[in-house]
Amino acid sequence: MKIRNLCALLLALMLLALAGCGQKEQPTQPENPDVPQEEEAAPVRLVCSNGSTTLRFSREEDGHWLWADDKTFPLDESYALTLLETVQGIESLPPVTTAAQLADYGLESSAKYVTLTDSQDTSVTYRLGSESDGSVYVYREGAEATVYAVPDLLGQIGRSIYDMMALPELPQLTAENVTSLTVTAGERTLTLTPAEGAWTADGRDVTDQLADLTAWLGDMHLAACVDWRPSAGAAALCGLDKPAVTLTAAYTHAGADRSLTLTVGGQRGAGYCVTVSDDDTVYLMSAEALAPLLTLAQSGLE
């Protein structure tokens, strides 16, 4: 009887195996291209407030970050990217405490915050409190029991939008690419002309006298933005209605004739207000850098 039952079991197993061999594996159904796939959330808006000034940044379709209040502003997006990196890393820091009294960290009624919004319109807000050893105490809204000490964040949201401007680069002017230089101060005008690598004025070789000036001309830089899209009265406030000195340069670049006009106005802190050619933005240039030009304007070629 046992042998008969065993044979019957083996026969049943063989029949099941033969039945399986004749069946084809059903192919996996491809994804329907007409059904939209869920996109991974990515940061698209960043808002920060230091308690008195609020700055808003937005990520455009090309991936670049702009100042949301005026997208024509020439933002140096490295500032926004650095802030974004800091904010995204907050909750990877070790918490200061898991049972914090917010008042102990200046967080009870904080007006300083950073809000990050992603492409699915989900927002996270972090509140900033008091400083400690170069860091600021932070908690995430909705998770107030956990406080973090975040380095550098307070300084990052304390900048003005002008501090974040991508400043224009000025041309490098040398005896090889300059056609002529004109320095005007009040009623005095001085024209400098390059000749075979040297500088002349009224036919005289003044190369040695212009050593400091020519070194600066080859390495001119703007220090900061003072006023972008200034109002009608800004020129007078910055001393640009009666400039201390104006430098006009005719030069060539990539085979084309170019010109540069640098207008130097009044002093502000450690620098002078300046404008560049047709750009009405008021910039700051350091007094140290401008010293050779100002000396030439005041004393001439003695």
Can you describe what each PLM-predicted range is?
Residues C21-E302:
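A short-motif feature that recognizes glycine-rich, charge-decorated loops
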Residues M1-A19:
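Sec-dependent bacterial lipoprotein signal peptides
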